[in-house]
Amino acid sequence: MADTDDIIDYESDDLTEYEDDEEDGESLETSDIDPKSSYKIVESTSTHIEDAHSNLKHIGNHISALKRRYTRRISLFEIAGIIAESYNLLQRGRLPLVSEFSDETMKQNMLHVIIQEIEEGSCPIVIEKNGELLSVNDFDKDGLKFHLDYIIKIWKLQKRY
């Protein structure tokens, strides 16, 4: 029977704990909430929104920087278009924009003149890439030289250069 008394005592302890919880609940309901504490919650939320906004702005700036860096790379397709347009304009009577312009320049193969213009950075052709108008000088010099060397190798194999 001593065991049953322990069980009854144990159950009665649990009941008193529940009664204490109910009393705490009533005190919370009847207490007045200080309006300043609610303002703190709103302020922290607005701060969180401002932090998120600044974070999004930082990400946007990072993406813009990547686009600018990507824009500076020239593709083989783009350099072929610049060469073709420059060739077309030279055939129509545009004077070559090379540093040492002479009668010898006019006698040279047009492909040599075009490559010389591009290497000197005086090629007048402008292309649009990612919403920006770019000349040959705006592109990465190493990539430009790599593509020009590749195109010249092909022309030499075809005996055009």
Swiss-Prot record:
Ranges for region Disordered: 1-35
Induction statement: Expressed in the early phase of the viral replicative cycle. Expression seems to continue throughout virus infection.
Top-level lineage group: Viruses
Localization per record: Virion
Keywords noted in UniProt: DNA-directed RNA polymerase, Early protein, Nucleotidyltransferase, Transcription, Transferase, Virion
Residue ranges, compositional bias (Acidic residues): 1-32
Disulfide bonds: none
Enzyme Commission designation: 2.7.7.6
Pfam families noted in UniProt: Pox_RNA_Pol_19
One GO location term (cellular component): DNA-directed RNA polymerase complex
GO terms, molecular function: DNA binding; DNA-directed RNA polymerase activity
The keyword Amino-acid biosynthesis belongs to this UniProt entry's keyword annotation: no
UniProt keyword annotation of Cytoplasm present: no
Coiled-coil stretches: none
GO biological process: DNA-templated transcription
Catalytic activity entry: RNA(n) + a ribonucleoside 5'-triphosphate = RNA(n+1) + diphosphate
Stated role: Part of the DNA-dependent RNA polymerase which catalyzes the transcription of viral DNA into RNA using the four ribonucleoside triphosphates as substrates. Responsible for the transcription of early, intermediate and late genes. DNA-dependent RNA polymerase associates with the early transcription factor (ETF), itself composed of OPG118 and OPG133, thereby allowing the early genes transcription. Late transcription, and probably also intermediate transcription, require newly synthesized RNA polymerase.
Assembly notes: The DNA-dependent RNA polymerase used for intermediate and late genes expression consists of eight subunits Rpo30/OPG66, Rpo7/OPG90, Rpo22/OPG103, Rpo147/OPG105, Rpo18/OPG119, Rpo19/OPG131, Rpo132/OPG151 and Rpo35/OPG156. The same holoenzyme, with the addition of the transcription-specificity factor OPG109, is used for early gene expression.
Family assignment from sequence similarity: Belongs to the poxviridae DNA-directed RNA polymerase 19 kDa subunit family.
Name used for this protein in its record: DNA-directed RNA polymerase 19 kDa subunit
Organism: Monkeypox virus
